[in-house]
Amino acid sequence: ILNKSTLNIFPKPWLLSTIQLASGVIWMAGMWTLKLQPVPKVSKKIIFSLAPVALFHTIAHVSACVSFSKMAVSFTHVIKAAEPVFSVILTSVFMNETFSAMTYVSLLPIVAGCSLAAMKEISFSIGGMNYALVSNLGSVLRNVFSKKLLNEFTYIDGTNMYALISIISLCYLAPVAYLIEG
């Protein structure tokens, strides 16, 4: 709701996404400076490994923000609620994992609920829906590949991994946001 309120006053979702990422990066820099969080040991290998994860993070973040700018927050969240469905499908494809029959059955209420809510939506926007779907896809791909990396780079905790992803994501997003919204 805060994103939507902000976008009503400042209708620049790409720049808002950039400001949000920059805020997180500044916060983590403060945490590292004050030694409240250990500074991660960063190498070229980890930066190159995190680059695709950060790209998916960027896509997920900015797509959600653009979706909020195009339609009701409630409908964006209805679409985002389908993320577990995306997660099961993409985890099966990329991680070669199989799930129990109960996992698939548990997705049925999600699909039914999202479908029912979508049918009742008054402020429908195909653009907003597409951005929300792209956000789901980006979030799930980020999570799938992050999971792989957490197993590979065990010396970096989840907080620092997320911070590094956010820094790279900010590097991706800032110039694009500037070009799109100035």
Residues of each region from the PLM?
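Polytopic endomembrane small-metabolite transporters, centered on the Drug/Metabolite Transporter
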Residues: 1-182
